[in-house]
C-alpha cells in the first residue's frame, strides 16, 4: 500500500458580468470561449451539437510553465488536459466540468449564473483541485488564493470586455 496522501485545493469566486444569464451562459463553452478569451486553444473530441452540452469532451494544452510562471524542467513536455462537461442546464444556468491532467491533477469546475439585477449576472465559480501524485501535489501548492484570484479576475476582465464590445480583448504583449 502506498503512503501517498493527496493534496486538495478549493476556491470560490463571484464575478459580476454586464449581461443577462441568457447572454453569458453560451460563452461558457470550449468553442465559444475562443470568441472572448485571448490565447484559448482547444480540440473538440465529442459533442453532438458542436458546442457545450452534457458529455461534451475536449482537450486543452497544458501551459509549459507552472502557475508561478516558472518554466518546466527541460525534460518535462507540456501535456494535455482532458475535459468533460458533467452538468449542463441552460434553464437554470448551471454548468460543470471535470478535467484531468494525467498523473498529476484532477479538477472540478462548477459555475452557477444568477440574475443580479436587470442586465447584470452574478457568476458563482467553484474550483476543487486534487493531486494525483507527489508531482501534482507540488503543483497544487502554487494554486493559492492570490494565484486563483488573479486567474479569475483575468477571466472576468476578458469576458466582460467581450460582453461590452462584442470583441476579444487584445492579448497582452510581453
Segments from the language model and where they lie:
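Hydrophobic ligand-binding cavity/cleft-lining segments
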Residues: 1-51
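Short, surface-exposed coil-to-beta transition loops
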Residues: 10-12, 78-83, 105-110
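A short, structured loop/turn motif at beta-sheet edges
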Residues: 18-22, 87-93, 112-122
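Hydrophobic pocket/interface hotspot
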Residues: 23-28, 34, 58, 85, ...
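Short, intrinsically disordered, mixed-charge
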Residues: 26-33, 90, 157, 161-164
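Short beta-strand segments that buttress and anchor functional surface loops
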Residues: 56-74, 95-102
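Hydrophobic-cavity lipid-handling domains and compact docking modules
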Residues: 72-88
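Beta-strand/loop substructures that line and gate deep hydrophobic ligand-binding cavities in soluble
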Residues: 98-153, 161, 170-172
Amino acid at each position: 500500500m502506498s503512503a501517498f496522501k493527496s493534496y486538495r485545493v478549493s476556491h470560490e469566486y463571484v464575478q459580476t458580468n454586464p449581461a443577462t444569464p441568457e447572454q453569458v451562459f453560451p460563452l461558457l463553452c470550449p468553442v465559444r470561449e475562443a470568441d472572448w478569451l485571448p490565447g484559448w486553444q482547444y480540440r473538440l473530441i465529442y459533442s453532438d451539437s458542436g458546442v457545450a452540452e452534457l458529455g461534451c469532451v475536449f482537450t486543452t494544452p497544458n501551459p509549459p510553465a507552472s502557475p508561478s510562471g516558472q518554466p518546466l524542467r527541460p525534460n518535462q513536455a507540456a501535456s494535455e488536459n482532458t475535459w468533460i462537461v458533467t452538468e449542463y442546464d441552460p434553464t437554470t444556468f448551471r454548468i460543470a466540468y471535470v478535467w484531468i491532467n494525467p498523473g498529476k491533477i484532477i479538477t472540478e469546475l462548477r459555475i452557477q449564473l444568477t440574475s443580479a439585477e436587470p442586465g447584470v449576472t452574478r457568476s458563482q465559480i467553484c474550483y476543487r483541485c486534487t493531486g494525483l501524485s507527489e508531482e501534482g501535489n507540488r503543483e497544487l501548492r502554487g494554486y493559492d488564493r492570490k494565484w486563483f484570484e488573479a486567474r479569475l479576475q483575468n477571466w472576468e476582465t476578458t469576458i466582460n470586455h467581450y460582453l461590452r464590445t462584442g470583441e476579444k480583448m487584445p492579448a497582452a504583449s510581453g
